């Protein structure tokens, strides 16, 4: 639900915000600040408009220990993964909104993260482009072997992209429902199994609209 802290939770997972209590661990490592192992992709691509596609994709590597040869190899692979090879030397201002989001995705992938965090990055795109990117991101994650945590208000997107859906509600937010999404790939919106899970998830989402956090028990 809106305002329940989904994006705040994602920022904590990215090390951008510190939790008021507890800590976040990735394979035993505490996440306390941004790092190449966990990368966040935002709603807007936030590209450098004066740079080419390749330059934008490789900008994060310029602050690290990577050699020129390794940087070029990583950039080339990331651009290939998002299918932008023909536009590698184009200025990003010349690209469509969907292509710019692919550049932002490649910029995240070039770091070879273990965890990719997505904050509704496809919400402003047209339906066709959004559907294509949803499938591509899931496919790339499976091929490269990294995990994804993404925030969405789109139930179809949750079923198409996810292995588990977590519904939050209330303010401050609480996890009120969880649902495993055990479906084979590729997933199509018209598949009966996809539609069945979508219906279950929609029911949970509607129940969350009426969620009220239980009052703490008090002693007489």
Task: Label each PLM-derived region with a short phrase.
Residues 51-58:
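Short coil-to-helix segment of the ABC ATPase nucleotide-binding domain corresponding to the Q-loop/switch region
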Residues 112:
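Conserved catalytic motifs of ABC-family nucleotide-binding domains
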Residues 91-95, 99:
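Conserved ABC ATPase signature
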Residues 22-34:
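Conserved ABC transporter NBD signature motif
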Residues 14:
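Helix-to-loop junction immediately C-terminal to a conserved catalytic motif
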């Amino acid at each position: 639900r809106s305002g329940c802290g989904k994006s705040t939770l994602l920022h904590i997972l990215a090390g951008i915000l510190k939790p008021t209590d507890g800590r976040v661990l990735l394979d035993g490592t505490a996440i306390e600040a941004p790092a190449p192992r966990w990368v966040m992709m935002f709603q807007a691509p936030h590209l450098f408009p004066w740079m080419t596609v390749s330059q934008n994709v490789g900008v994060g590597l310029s602050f690290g220990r990577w050699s020129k040869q390794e940087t070029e190899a990583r950039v080339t692979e990331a651009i290939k993964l998002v299918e932008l090879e023909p536009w590698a030397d184009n200025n990003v201002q010349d690209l469509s909104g969907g292509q710019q989001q692919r550049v932002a995705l490649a910029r995240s992938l070039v770091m070879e993260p273990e965890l990719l965090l997505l904050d509704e990055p496809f919400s402003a795109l047209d339906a066709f482009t959004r559907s294509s990117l949803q499938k591509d991101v899931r496919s790339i994650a499976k091929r490269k072997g990294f995990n994804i945590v993404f925030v969405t208000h789109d139930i179809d997107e949750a079923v198409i992209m996810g292995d588990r859906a977590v519904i939050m509600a209330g303010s401050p937010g609480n996890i009120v429902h969880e649902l495993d999404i055990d479906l084979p790939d590729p997933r199509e919106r018209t598949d009966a199994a996809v539609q069945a899970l979508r219906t279950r998830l929609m029911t949970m989402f509607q129940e969350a609209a009426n969620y009220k956090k239980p009052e703490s028990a008090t002693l007489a």
